[in-house]
Structures are given as C-alpha cells and as structure tokens.
C-alpha cells in the first residue's frame, strides 16, 4: 500500500470551503473510480486541512496524481501545499 498526505493552508475560510467541496464532489469520486483505495480530508483550522489518500501501489498513486495536476496548480494559487508520501511499513488493525 502507498499513502500520500497533503497539508493545505488556504488564504481564507471561503477558499477552503470551496476547494473541499470540490474535492468531495469531483476529485474523490473520480480518483476512487481510477483506483485509489480511500481518501479522507481532515480539518485542522478554519483555513487548513490535510488529506490522506491510500493507493494499492506507487504506480497507481502517480496515475491519480497525474489526473489532479491542473487542479493542484489552481489550488496552489493563494495556498500553501506540503506533500508527504511513502510505502506502508507497518500496518495494524483490530483482531
């Protein structure tokens, strides 16, 4: 499994609401249909979120990232994006 975490700090609360609504209704459904395992968006503050995207492998994660390139460029205008990503090292779940 491959995971990508993106931290986004928006210029305003209204920008955050617009982008997260777009993520929920457009980006996530499309990405899930293209092979992403799951996607979650977590609120940090009134203008800050982080997303967690899980993929079966890096190839699929890169394919999904390619689908979002133009959108991410637009989101980055007036926002600060920080990305972390990597292969699952240890996984745990309840028995």
What are these regions (language model features)?
Residues 69-73:
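Low-complexity, intrinsically disordered Gly/Pro/Thr-rich segments
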Residues 1-67, 77-95:
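Short S/T/G/P-rich N-terminal loop/turn motif that feeds into the first structured element of a domain
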């Amino acid at each position: 499994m491959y995971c990508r975490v993106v931290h986004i700090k928006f210029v305003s609360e209204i920008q955050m609401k617009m982008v997260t609504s777009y993520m929920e209704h457009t980006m996530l459904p499309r990405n899930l249909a293209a092979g992403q395992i799951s996607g979650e968006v977590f609120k940090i503050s009134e203008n800050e979120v982080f997303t967690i995207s899980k993929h079966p492998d890096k190839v699929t994660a890169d394919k999904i990232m390619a689908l979002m390139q133009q959108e991410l460029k637009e989101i980055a205008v007036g926002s600060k994006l920080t990305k972390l990503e990597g292969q699952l090292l240890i996984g745990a779940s309840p028995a």
